[in-house]
Amino acid sequence: MPVLIESIGNLERRLTFSVPEDRLESHVDERLREIARTARINGFRAGKVPAKVIEQRFGEKVRAEVLDSLLRETLDSAIRAHSLRLAGAARIDHANEGRLNFVATFEVVPDFGEIDVSKFSVVRRTARVTDVDIDQMIENLRLQRRTWRVAEHGAQVGHLVALETWSQAGDERLPIEGVEAGSTILGSGVMFEQIERGLEGLSKGDEKVLDVTFPDDWRVTQLAGKAVQVHVKVIEVSEPVLLEVNEEFIKSFGVKSGKLEDFRADIRANLERELKGALVSHLRREVGEQLIAAYAHVEMPPRLVEKEARLMLAKQIEQIRLSGRDPTGIPDDAHIGFMDAACKRVLVGLLVGEIAGRNRLRLDPMRVTETLHLIASTYEEPEEVFEMYRNDPKLMEGVQSLVMEEQVIEWIADRAKKTEQVLSFQEAIQQ
């Protein structure tokens, strides 16, 4: 049967083809002879098992494996011969006539026309980790391990205040009866800023009425956009007790030597990794937005977009489960809400592949190795994690895709109009 290609949509194709029966049988016979040379079956010496027994024992499985291999090989050959560029995996079904006739249905990459990235504008941000950043991180680590003791003076920024509150908004009282118990660290923003400022200087047992105007988008709808009297009573004020940066403290973060210089070196490496990730993410987002704006008119493969939307939904459902919530109430068609974002993801992904192909960009193996080391370094046993990735094709495929995307994004940025911007570490990671 000759290969037949049909267009069944703007981007969907149907390819009808067959696997030659003589080729299938030849490959099956060859594979069965290989098995016969080493097969061990009770009642027969190794290598002396009759061909009929080998056929009965292994024939069905071998034929299925060989057919699958030839099926893929024949399809790939037909796709190459007709210069088709698939935008996802093909679905293969048996044709109505003949056991070795098949129909492959798939979507193709759309025609993007000329891709001119010289019109793009990017901001090349640079930043570096300083000793001040390391000092700040050490202080943050001390704060994470802090304990509390009762303060003998009024509350200050950084103090933990336990309190009871009730609010009066016109004729409405919240709560209707009693009070609400809560706590906040002054300056943390856990409570509304005007309330936290009003608590400064208060001690245990103090009561105060605060005049507060809440913004229109305040999370408590009954208070949003209203001038409210908030009645507060301080139950307790506690001040933080920070651990000393000594050998014990340093070792608790996995620095075996317990030395301050090694601790600072580890922190620097972690901050530099975080900084690099932030700069790359910002550039990826900036370039991605311009790719989307420039090629939003190009139709995307609908099945590929739907698949991406379902993957995004599945990820959200998994996050819901991990948070301890029940996702069973999510409707079956919830993926529709992700279709727009999925379309943009597919667009950027296909453009990245198209740019890489047109400009013969090749995956940099050294960069893949560096990325693997970077990922592994965030774990307690980096060598084991590195080998785990190396030996898992699916994990490696994800890393390789990430690296290839970064290479293409940088290729685009190098050819776009550039503005240089020097940032501090904090500015870089917060943008």
UniProtKB/Swiss-Prot annotation:
Keyword annotations: Cell cycle, Cell division, Chaperone, Cytoplasm, Isomerase, Rotamase
Entries under InterPro entries matching the protein: PPIase_dom_sf (IPR046357), Trig_fac (IPR005215), Trigger_fac_C (IPR008880), Trigger_fac_C_sf (IPR037041), Trigger_fac_ribosome-bd_bac (IPR008881), Trigger_fac_ribosome-bd_sf (IPR036611), Trigger_fact/SurA_dom_sf (IPR027304)
GO MF terms held by the record: peptidyl-prolyl cis-trans isomerase activity; protein folding chaperone; ribosome binding
Short name of any one Pfam family annotated for the protein: Trigger_C
Location, primary (coarse class): cytoplasm
Gene Ontology biological-process entries: 'de novo' cotranslational protein folding; cell division; chaperone-mediated protein folding; protein transport; protein unfolding
Keyword Cell membrane among record annotations: no
Gene3D superfamilies: 3.10.50.40, Trigger factor ribosome-binding domain, Trigger factor, C-terminal domain
Enzymatic reactions: [protein]-peptidylproline (omega=180) = [protein]-peptidylproline (omega=0)
Subcellular localization: Cytoplasm
Family matches, as PANTHER family: TRIGGER FACTOR CHAPERONE AND PEPTIDYL-PROLYL CIS/TRANS ISOMERASE, TRIGGER FACTOR-LIKE PROTEIN TIG, CHLOROPLASTIC
HAMAP family from the UniProt entry: Trigger_factor_Tig
Name listed for the protein in its UniProt record: Trigger factor
